[in-house]
Structures are given as C-alpha cells and as structure tokens.
Amino acid sequence: MSIFPTKILLATDGSEEARLAAQAAAELSKNTGSEVHVAYVLPSPRELRGHHLYSQEVMRSVLEQAEGEARTFLEEQAKQVGKSGGKVAETHLETGEPDKEIVRLSEELGAGTIVIGSRGLGAVRRALMGGVSESVVRHAHCPVFVVRE
C-alpha cells in the first residue's frame, strides 16, 4: 500500500493561484504516478449577486459565456498539467457552491488529495465571506494541499 494518492483533484478557478496549484498538482502526479482530475465549479444562478435584477435571457447568456470560458480554462489547465509531466484523467465542470462541490466531487472520485489555490483573502474579508480553500480544508475527507502565491 502506498502512502501517495492514486487520484488528485485539482480545483481551479482561473486565478493565478489556481495556475500555481496546477503546477503543484502536475509535479505531485509526476512524482507519485497519481492521476489528476481537473475541476472548475461555476456558481449556480442563485448564488450570483444581483441575479434577480436581470431577465432570464440575460442570465442565460451570462451563464453560457461563463461556461464557455470555464471549459476553455479547464482544457488549458489540463494541457498544462500534461505538459508538466502530470497524468490527466479527466476534467469536470460542476455548478453550485464551489467549496461544497469540490468536497463532493473529491468523495465521488475517491481522491486521495485535493490541490487548491489560496486566494489570499484579507482577515476582514475572510471573516465575512470565508474562503473556498479554507472551507475545503475543514470539510474534505482527505488531505488538502493549499498553494499560495
């Protein structure tokens, strides 16, 4: 039995920290032989600020554009992980609350490690909003590798 995970869930969001997390996941995969699952979580329409101010058509258009951008970023991240020597198994585009969806997907996949970037929220914003990476660390069933800039 190996102490290294066979599956790594890389949670990405398009930020610079997420790109650094992708590098870390690639290196971990390369060194352990683990496969990498790359995930991006789009907020559901209910979670978007001001969603009730726009028509359904406008919201649908915004969400379609966001989904297209997320798919493009997911594919770029997967290619980058592969170019860096990581073994990419699959990409996952989910919708919902990012922290909850990351934890759910990690359990569903049987991931041994989650790799996620830290957005570096200041103390006040973190106290008011909480952070996705912080919530994932608290609720995940497996170790979480948080990458800082």
Language model: regions and residue ranges:
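Small/aliphatic-rich secondary-structure junction motif
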Residues: 2-57
